[in-house]
């Protein structure tokens, strides 16, 4: 694989093409890299020229919890996006149904085995398509997606709305 390999948006952190790569000091993308996958999907949706190899090389030591074994720190997600020119706003869970429209969202949900990041990319019809969520990418309203997580014993604990940087003409 080289820097020009294009995976597009990623829907599985366990994909054999990249899942066993190190993440943090002791983790792997497959086991603990959902935060990195969410970041990649947001950045890739904003700029289709982004490729996984250079993205991974630049972020493989992003701040993690417990040396990578407990995934990505939420503050690292926000900091990384803001450093790249993205506008990031916290969305109150109780107000998600009426939240303003963003180019993308990142959901942090708690479930039986720990926490999990899921990126949603805005569609033209007013929904988001959610990636790396243990099933096929699904277009849904944000509030419906959060309810679907609750219905499967996952509990949304944080949601961020993301606006993509303005491209120079």
Which residue ranges define each predicted feature?
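Active-site-adjacent structural segments surrounding the nucleophilic cysteine of cysteine proteases
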Residues: 1-66
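Conserved active-site-adjacent core of cysteine acyl-enzyme catalytic domains
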Residues: 43-167
